[in-house]
């Protein structure tokens, strides 16, 4: 079952006040300000935090999830994250980013070969195993699954090919991975959202 979330609109200090409170270089602050001017990018981190809060994840995981979209948009470097938020958060973000290499491998496999159910099943299972092996902290995998849920919600306005590719990736890799890790809520949500496409 898909959870309906609403990014909380509780009173927060303006973005500029929060940004000024961070001890970042002016160049980095400018990048963050540019990224924050596009509301969808900001909401991804908040949505990921809401997903992870439902799983009772620790504060470090929540902070890494909130910072991750900024790193993806190249508004924060890994060094900026380590300096401002700490090594542990940086390591989680790096682990999540490392998992993106699998996306391109899976996309090449889908587009580059004829359908062979047994070989595809073995390939996908080996991808799942690689994902677990390549990250040092399983929390990075959970953050990535939350990010994929957000990606499934965002692709509804994309072209058909993109929607199908993201849905296949989530249904064949991340939903079974969530099941393997015993996180039923994420598994169901990934499957339900992927089924739409």
Region locations from a protein language model:
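Active-site helical microenvironments for divalent-metal-assisted chemistry
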Residues: 1-197
